Amino acid sequence: MALTKAEMSEYLFDKLGLSKRDAKELVELFFEEIRRALENGEQVKLSGFGNFDLRDKNQRPGRNPKTGEDIPITARRVVTFRPGQKLKSRVENASPKEE
């Protein structure tokens, strides 16, 4: 099961007493700010959680798995996430939930 933006909004509604509309807008604005920063080439550091970084990947040779034909894989920029130590520790020590 995955945590969704709708579930995050519902949590803010329940815990902070925000209106459903304000809770949804807060979640949307939070993620929009992360997107904006990454689009502008900035690193995003969330203390106690982790860092979103941009990494430029060079062009490299590849192969079409169906035909075996050599094809170039174009250079591109990718987003990476590195979890912080606090997040790593909490995940390692968490009890797995049954689905």
Curated annotation (Swiss-Prot):
GO terms for biological process: DNA recombination; positive regulation of metabolic process; regulation of DNA-templated transcription; regulation of translation. GO terms for cellular component: cytosol. GO terms for molecular function: DNA binding; structural constituent of chromatin. Disulfide bonds: none annotated. PROSITE patterns: HISTONE_LIKE (PS00045). Residues 49-75 are annotated as: Disordered. Keywords: DNA recombination, DNA-binding, Transcription, Transcription regulation, Translation regulation. The keyword DNA-binding applies. The keyword Transcription regulation applies. This protein is one of the two subunits of integration host factor, a specific DNA-binding protein that functions in genetic recombination as well as in transcriptional and translational control. PANTHER family: DNA-BINDING PROTEIN HU (PTHR33175), INTEGRATION HOST FACTOR SUBUNIT ALPHA (PTHR33175:SF2). Heterodimer of an alpha and a beta chain. Belongs to the bacterial histone-like protein family. This is Integration host factor subunit alpha.
